[in-house]
Amino acid sequence: MNAALLYALAAAGANVLGGLVITTHSRGGRTTQRLLIAFGAGFMLAVALLAMLPHTLREGGANAAVTVLVGYLLVHLTQHVLTPHFHFGEETHHVGHWTGVSALLGLLLHTFFDGVAIASGFRVGSTLGFLVFIAILLHKIPEGVTVASVMLASGNTRRMALGGTAALGVATVLGVLVTDQLGALQRHGLALSAGVTLYVAASNLMPEVQQERSRSSAIMVFVGAACFLLAWWMLGGEA
């Protein structure tokens, strides 16, 4: 079993863990969720801008930049068409049944590209692969919390909510497996996933931080970015 697949399995487990937080009534960790989202926003933004994008543009030039934009807009389109109600964190009020289904469908594409990002990172090198994995892992638990709570709020059972988080994990693993087999994803996967990662950091996570208006959340964004820089330096500083 290759390293990318092992890391994808770990990321999938974090999705399920996020679902367990909700389905087992362990709801006392909202502050922890908030800080984790802020830390993940800073780390993911740094990974996308300082590691994934430079390598993508160095290898593919202007054409790669277009592919990055396609990845960004693809997630934007799916979230605004399928999941207009989507936001990271726990859903606390009742929503319609379609909202739960659409949230799961939209996130399945997103988590598939999490797997593509992990596989593409490891195809470049172990340093980039590991840093991309950490960035993805940091938002996997809030992601599991999100889909489980939205499904519960839309009238689904706890078993179905937990099954939804497991489906997200399966999509991540599939992203790795498909990338390993599909030549087009091997060539363009890093550029696409750079766009997806940039969208998740800048358009999903950062608005959650800004909405909180919390000093600790704002600081954690900087801590997340600083931790990326430290890890990048310790691992050799070469994407």
Where are the regions that the model predicts?
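Intrinsically disordered, metal-sensing/regulatory segments
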Residues: 1-239
